[in-house]
Regions:
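Catalytic cores of Mg2+-dependent Asp-rich isoprenoid enzymes
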Residues: 1-180, 186-277
């Protein structure tokens, strides 16, 4: 499972192993289940209607712990990213791992993935660019903010020291995922613009994107501060500190250096920033 993580997300392949077990395994599995949905949504070689049907198949598979409804899916070898091809081919083994989790843990993952899939489907049906900042914010919530909520539910369930701060953490939880989503959009903005693949309407400027990312990162900072204040389990703090550091550095690069990519030095600095945790 962790080899799939390395093939599909360089940043989470670093941060998820920082978590303690058993939550480490569950977060890794949940990430990959969400990543399957992301891959379906992003696969432009399928029509929006076909992708919508596949998303329904996938959430049914997660709910029932059976891949019977996905057996008719097409070959994904045309996907240019080999890691995503491997992920799609591994969906049966992912569902088998999910089946081994306690029922409440399976239900939690399904609950949040169902919310994300419903949001993805809503935007697939529209099949149009985001018309304003409100729509962009809503999209980011469904595809990333919900992940932050799921992670927070996992953290507070695992580490009872966080229970007194649960309401405050859940209020800020969407920012944990949205900050990463927004800096990914910033990172890809230049390339997408060059390839004429932008999904923004003219009503959304690059400055709007920077402003949303800045706001989200400030909320993620508050989230991290609460983890420190309540002396959360060190691995949970390290996971969040690493992801926050990467997002913050990517935003700083975009604002001050005029480029959007993170290189190995950025990842190394993010790792060094949490070694004291």
């Amino acid at each position: 499972m962790f080899d799939l993580l390395q093939q599909t997300s360089r940043s989470f392949a670093v941060s998820i192993p920082m978590l303690p077990n058993p939550i480490r395994e569950e977060v890794a599995l949940a990430y990959l289940l969400f990543r399957v949905a992301d891959t379906i949504e992003d696969e432009g070689s399928f029509t929006p209607e076909a992708r919508s049907e596949m998303l329904t198949d996938w959430i049914d598979s997660v709910r029932t712990c059976s891949t019977e409804g996905t057996e008719h899916w097409s070959d994904f070898s045309s996907i240019p990213h080999s890691g995503y091809v491997a992920l799609m081919e591994a969906r049966r083994s992912l569902i088998e791992r999910l089946k081994s989790l306690p029922l409440p843990h399976r239900e939690l993952i399904h609950q949040y993935l169902a919310k994300t899939v419903a949001g993805m489907d809503q935007f697939l049906v529209k099949n149009d660019a985001w018309h304003d900042v409100g729509e962009l914010r809503e999209y980011c919530y469904y595809v990333a903010g919900v992940v932050g909520e799921m992670l927070t539910a996992m953290f507070t369930s695992y580490d009872r020291r966080l229970l007194p701060a649960e309401d405050e953490l859940m209020r800020l939880a969407p920012s944990v995922g949205e900050s990463l989503q927004l800096v990914n959009m910033i990172r890809d903005y230049q390339t997408d613009n060059e390839r004429q693949r932008l999904y923004f309407s003219e009503a959304i400027s690059f400055d709007d994107l920077l402003a949303l990312a800045t706001e989200s990162i400030e909320s993620a900072r508050e989230f991290l501060d609460i983890l420190f204040r309540y002396e959360a389990q060190p691995g949970i703090v390290a996971f969040n500190a690493f992801n926050f550091s990467l997002a913050e550095r990517a935003l700083q690069n975009a604002k001050s250096l005029g480029h959007y990519k993170l290189d190995r030095a950025d990842v190394r600095m993010a790792t060094q920033s949490i070694r004291a945790v």
